[in-house]
Curated annotation (Swiss-Prot):
SUPFAM superfamilies: Acid proteases. Gene3D superfamilies: 2.60.40.1960, Acid Proteases. Glycans are attached at N106, N433. GO terms for molecular function: aspartic-type endopeptidase activity. The keyword Hydrolase applies. The lineage of its organism: Eukaryota, Metazoa, Ecdysozoa, Nematoda, Chromadorea. Its EC number is 3.4.23.-. The keyword RNA-binding does not apply. Aspartic protease, which is part of the necrosis cell death pathway. Involved in neuronal cell degeneration. Involved in heat stress response. It is found in: Cytoplasm; Lysosome; Secreted. Disruption phenotype: RNAi-mediated knockdown prevents muscle degeneration caused by bacterium A.dhakensis-mediated infection. RNAi-mediated knockdown prevents neuronal degeneration in a mec-4(u231), deg-1(u38) or gsa-1(Q227L) gain-of-function mutant background. The active site is at D112, D298. This is Aspartic protease 4.
Length: 444
């Protein structure tokens, strides 16, 4: 009897100890800074033509080459080149700091849920690579924890290839370090995007399945090495332009201070991007995705992108006027009265107000308002695909869960803890309302 009691007490103490250990492994957060996008930088310099030509060339590239990436991720080839066809970074604006090596070398990166590799400029890039020379560069000779790998790799963007090679070192983020983490030292960076970029490199947070050379992403290494408590991370972006706080990423959990329950979860439909089924896009009626479609939650762009014809329907609905090469402008005076555009996900309606989907930028000392919706024509075989960037994620707290292969969205809070209205609500179509009214009339 006494032996049984002792065994029971021992088991209870063991369980209690496990709980204490779990509590001691705290959540890790990365503070994000919000910077002007390259779009805004070019516009402020009066270079709209340069910006538009660059964006037009990117979309033309998508139309021509958009099928490569979607053929069962065939881009994981011998040469280690992958087509990051949805990557642009012209509109990226949320950046955070990581360190690599011992002693630490600091870099500003985009935490990008639309790609899976970490790359930063290399000290070994040639002097004529302007993009590389204008940013912080990793020096392997200065790090005592550096390990050589040497595999060559390239990532094809709309403006050319980022080329480099794989190295290993300690990569630290949010106060924890991924030891012997493979990453790419970039020796060639393409186009104006990376020359004028406010960031040094990219830290991909999508699934390992789309990583160049099968390199394990940083977050997955952190979880594997037991540096974070749970196999998920979450994004809170602050859309207030007057706030110094750009946002936060929580590694290994969810920050209850940043959102209002409940979280609406939808399953990942394909392990690669954070891809899920979206029910439809609605305004006064259905504007797009009428029969359901695939969508991607993407922190690497600030825009919302979709099939060109459906995006044009949205532009017409909100009263946007064509500007140049696919760009649309809205009168800034009309922003407060613009109609909401809603995205139905998991049966819930997530609405964006005019102030959410309009981007205000300065050009020649004047403020102009641009639509945050962009049309992209992908090959027919790819199917209907939408990209929900920071215009959406900035409005809704977003959870990326590897363990349960799901994405979650919830009503976000402001930096001072106030809920950002409106809250998500169950979707009820016009047909539902008409049906109810018809039933009421029949009862009478």
């Amino acid at each position: 009897m006494n032996r049984c009691i002792l065994l029971l007490l021992g088991a209870l103490l063991l369980v209690q100890g496990l709980h204490v250990h779990k509590r001691q492994q705290k959540l890790r957060t990365v503070s994000l800074k919000k910077q002007p996008t390259l779009r805004e930088t070019l516009l402020q310099a009066g270079s709209f033509e340069t910006f538009a030509k660059h964006r037009h060339g990117y979309k033309k590239y998508l139309k021509t080459n958009g099928n490569h990436h979607f053929d069962k991720y065939q881009a994981l080839n011998v040469e280690g080149e992958i087509d990051e066809l949805l990557r642009n970074y012209m509109d990226a604006q949320y950046f955070g700091t990581i360190s690599i090596g011992t002693p630490a070398q600091n870099f500003t990166v985009i935490f990008d849920t639309g790609s899976s590799n970490l790359w930063i400029p290399s000290k070994k890039c040639p002097f004529y690579d302007i993009a590389c020379m204008l940013h912080h560069r990793y020096d392997s000779k200065s790090s005592s924890t550096y390990k050589e790998d040497g595999r060559k790799m390239a990532i094809q963007y709309g403006t050319g290839s980022m080329k480099g090679f794989i190295s290993k070192d300690s990569v630290c983020v949010a106060g924890v370090c991924a030891e012997d983490q493979p990453f790419a030292e970039a020796t060639s960076e393409p186009g104006i995007t990376f020359v004028a970029a406010k960031f040094d490199g990219i830290l991909g947070m999508a699934y390992p399945e789309i990583a160049v050379l099968g390199v394990q992403p940083v977050f997955n290494t952190l979880f594997e090495q037991k540096k974070v408590p749970s196999n998920l991370f979450s994004f809170w972006l602050n859309r207030n332009p007057d706030s110094e706080i750009g946002g936060e990423i929580t590694f290994g959990g969810i920050d209850s201070r940043r959102y209002v329950e409940p979280i609406t979860y939808v399953p990942v439909t394909r392990k690669g991007y954070w891809q899920f089924k979206m029910d439809k896009v609605v305004g006064s009626g259905v504007l797009g995705c009428s029969n359901g479609c695939q969508a991607i939650a993407d922190t690497g762009t600030s825009l919302i992108a979709g099939p060109k014809a459906q995006i044009e329907a949205i532009q017409n609905f909100i009263g946007a006027e064509p500007l140049i090469k696919g760009e649309y402008m809205i009168s800034c005076d009309k922003v407060p009265t613009l109609p909401p555009v809603s995205f139905v996900i998991g049966g819930q309606e997530f609405s964006l107000k005019g102030e959410d989907y309009v981007l205000k930028v300065s050009q020649g000392g004047k403020t102009i308002c641009l639509s945050g919706f962009m049309g992209i024509d992908l090959p027919e075989r790819v199917g209907e695909l939408w990209i929900l960037g920071d215009v959406f994620i900035g409005r809704y707290y977003s959870v990326f869960d590897f363990d349960q292969n799901r994405v979650g969205f919830a009503q976000a809070k402001t930096a001072d803890g106030r809920p950002v209205d409106p809250a998500p609500r169950p979707f009820r179509s016009v047909f539902d309302n008409e049906s109810e009214e018809s039933m009421e009339q029949d009862d009478e």
